[in-house]
Design a protein with these regions (language model features):
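Short catalytic-loop micro-motif centered on adjacent basic/acidic residues
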Residues: 28-30, 56-57
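Active-site metal-binding core of divalent-cation-utilizing nuclease and nuclease-like domains
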Residues: 1-23, 27, 142
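Acidic, metal-dependent phosphodiester-chemistry machinery of nucleic-acid enzymes
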Residues: 1, 150-181
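A conserved mid-domain beta-alpha-beta active-site/ligand-binding segment of alpha/beta enzyme cores
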Residues: 86-161
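Short acidic-glycine loop/turn motifs at beta-strand connectors
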Residues: 22-24, 81-85
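Short beta-strand-loop-alpha-helix junction that forms the active-site gateway
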Residues: 25, 31-38
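Catalytic cores of nucleic-acid endonucleases
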Residues: 36-81
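Conserved beta-strand termini and adjacent loop/short-helix elements that scaffold enzyme active sites
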Residues: 8, 80-83, 92
Length: 181
């Protein structure tokens, strides 16, 4: 299947090092190099759990023995080992689905990753009203009420697959001008 990699994505009060977009799920990846500490990790874990279906932490070899004390048992753990001219990755633990966040809350968070033109496209393909002059939060709630969630997971991923960072500012301007009174 398709995969899109988005680096340094703001999520709540943290920044996800890597967000993997798959056809029906979002995966968060936190990277802790040998030079990093665990100072922000508790906050990052909470924030990742609000958005992602699965989470991994990738650690340097100095963290591999103790990282499991710092992340939940359902997070995957990957050890990155530096070789002379390459890096070797060892999966120490596979992730399990993140069921910790309330389902409704997590869907709302996932939709909040999308920009207004992307939400507008989801409304359009599902035959929904445009809700001009309504807040993003209102639109997200209406989408959640109207669109079956198994379909919505795929539509969120499709919007993120199609996202073009080179043209989005123009698309947002266009959306704003077409949604004025």
């Amino acid at each position: 299947g398709k995969v899109r990699i988005i680096e340094e994505k703001q999520i709540a009060k943290s920044r996800a090092d890597v967000m993997l977009v798959l056809e029906e799920k979002l995966i968060g990846v936190e990277i802790k190099s040998d030079a990093d500490t665990y100072a922000r990790l508790a906050r990052q874990v909470k924030d990742y759990n609000k958005f992602f279906d699965y989470n991994y932490v990738v650690v340097g070899s100095s963290h591999s023995k103790h990282i499991e004390e710092h992340v939940p048992e359902y997070w995957g753990i990957i050890e990155a080992i530096s070789k002379e001219e390459s890096v070797e990755f060892n999966v120490l633990r596979e992730p399990e689905i993140n069921k910790r966040a309330q389902r409704t809350y997590k869907m709302k968070r996932k939709l909040s990753i999308l920009w207004r033109p992307e939400l507008s496209h989801i409304q359009e393909i599902n035959g929904m009203p445009k809700y001009k002059q309504r807040s993003k939060d209102f639109v997200i709630t209406k989408i959640m009420e109207k669109v079956p969630w198994d379909l919505l997971h795929r539509q969120i991923s499709e919007e993120l697959f199609q996202r073009d960072y080179n043209t989005i500012s123009e698309a947002i301007k266009e959306w704003r001008s077409s949604n004025k009174h």
